[in-house]
Amino acid sequence: NELWSEDQDAWMASPYAPMGMAIPTEGGYILNGRWSFSSGTDHCNWLVIGALVGDADGKPAMPFQSLHVMVPRPDYTIIEDSWNVVGLQGTGSKDVVVEGAFIPDYRAIDAAKVMDGTAYKESGRDEALYRMPWTAVFPSAISAAVLGICEGALRTAIEYQKDRAGMLGKTSDDPYMMAAIGEASAEIRSSRAT
């Protein structure tokens, strides 16, 4: 409720790897860490991040336990100029840092329960969406963007080839070009259908 009760269109970034340490304290955890690859983070008011449960010395507790933690914007810092990768500037990925933020228990959940689809029991939600294992949901979220990129690239290629001339005439009349465009289109459509 906290995340979407006031703004149903609230966005969150998710540098998911458990790069931080969550030290148990009364009513929750004290969270510290630095996460890389937080795509789109400038546009988000929340993070969903991974953290290891730590002991009082800040070392991973045994047995090993990982959490998924929700962190509101005032509790993290975006590190500007931390993403300098050729061809991926548009992702808006940056590092984020959390230093000593208190995370109430209700904003953390055992990552193993999310992975196996049993986290819904603690959330009080019983709809099918909440019973799905993370491994069934996450790939769809990532592949949707990739399919969109592929469709955009195909449209651009078709537009570019439309009036382009090659050694043997218009490339739009070239059977090899038509075959390549057709194959790309079929691959994209079949990916969307699965």
Language model regions located:
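A generic structural signal for well-ordered coil/turn residues at beta-strand boundaries
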Residues: 18, 43, 65, 90-97
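DPxDG-like acidic metal-binding loop motif
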Residues: 34-77
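Active-site glycine-rich loop that binds ribose-phosphate moieties when present
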Residues: 14-16, 51, 71-85, 90
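Glycine-rich flavin
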Residues: 1-44, 61
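Beta-strand-enriched cores of mature, soluble protein domains
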Residues: 27-29, 55, 89
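C-terminal helix-coil-helix/basic helical segment that borders enzyme active sites and/or dimer interfaces
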Residues: 192-194
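Glycine-rich beta->alpha junctions and the first turn(s) of the following alpha-helix
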Residues: 86, 93-188
